[in-house]
Every structure is written in C-alpha cells, then in structure tokens.
Amino acid sequence: MKRLAIFCLFFFVQPTFAIGCINMKDNWIECLAQILKSEGGYVDDPRDNGGATNFGVTKKTYENWVGREVTKEDIKNLTIEDVAPIYKDRYWARVRADELVDGADLLLFDLSVHSGPRRSVKIAQETAGTVVDGLIGPKTVAAINAMDQTEFIKKFSENRLAFYKRIEAWKHFENGFRNRVKKTQIAAQQMVK
C-alpha cells in the first residue's frame, strides 16, 4: 500500500499538491491511495445513482465543486490532481480524519466517500456508543480514539455492512459492497500502530 501511495504522490499528483500534503497527517496520502484503488476510473453504470463517475467523484459532486454544469466528457477527463482536493475538503476534513487514530481515519474517510460524511459519522457514532446525530465533534472523536482499534475496526465494518444490506442498491452491488468493506477493514487494521 505504501508503494501505491508513493506512486500516486510522485507520478500522478503535481508537485505543488504534494508539497501541500507535507503538513497533513502522515497517512493522508496512503488513505487517498486506498480510496483511489477502490474507486477506480471512469464508470457510468445506470444502476448506480451516482451516474457518471471518475476516481469516485460523481458528476454532481464535481459540478458542485467547480460551480457549473459539466459534461460526461469532463468527468472522463478528470485527473487525480483534480479530485484530490475534493477528497480532502468534502470527505477527509468533514469526518475530521486528521484527528482520528490511524485505521479509524481510513474507515470514516472511505465510507464518507462511498455514502456521504453524515452516514459515515453516524456509523462511527453507533460503533463508539455516542449520540448518533451524524455530526462529528470532540466527544465522538474522543470516543473513537479511546476504543480498542481492532474492536472499532471490526464493529464499524459490521455496522457498515448492515447499512448496505438495508439499501436498494444492495441487490445489484452486494459483491462490490462486501469486497470494499473487507478490503477497507484489512487496510485499516494494517494501519493500526
């Protein structure tokens, strides 16, 4: 995983972005590389509510980011340099991943990307036994960080899978959901120090 992170940093991301990452939590790039590995490239599956997507960024998300309508061709042409700031602002920062212990940061970040920051926080709150309101504050961060991380990772992954089983897309994407949860769980556990 570290090789993939380094590869993404030095071969896909422009030097100015890489320099901006120096002050971030050490494993931001490793977490981003894991997300990009899971998200893949351009897809436009009619069964997926996200529609045209590239590197996991939907057309709607990108339109909100740039403040204008975009075409599917614009989405096809996205680069890692285009999407990395979106990931940092819209998903990483909104779950306060910089404040979370290693492993938990990846779990919340990944689910934030896949199902939205609020859903990610709710599942984390359910897992940590705090008030479930979808708003991550100091109490939620402290509760997550205080848990045994192997236990947190296991329970969070179980709760995430239970959430997926309740949504309509489960019948079409069950295998993909299961694989993503398992791969993210393994990667998160490997980050625990």
Identify what each model region corresponds to.
Residues 4-13:
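Sec-dependent N-terminal signal peptides
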Residues 17-193:
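Cell-wall polysaccharide-cleaving catalytic domain and substrate-binding groove, primarily
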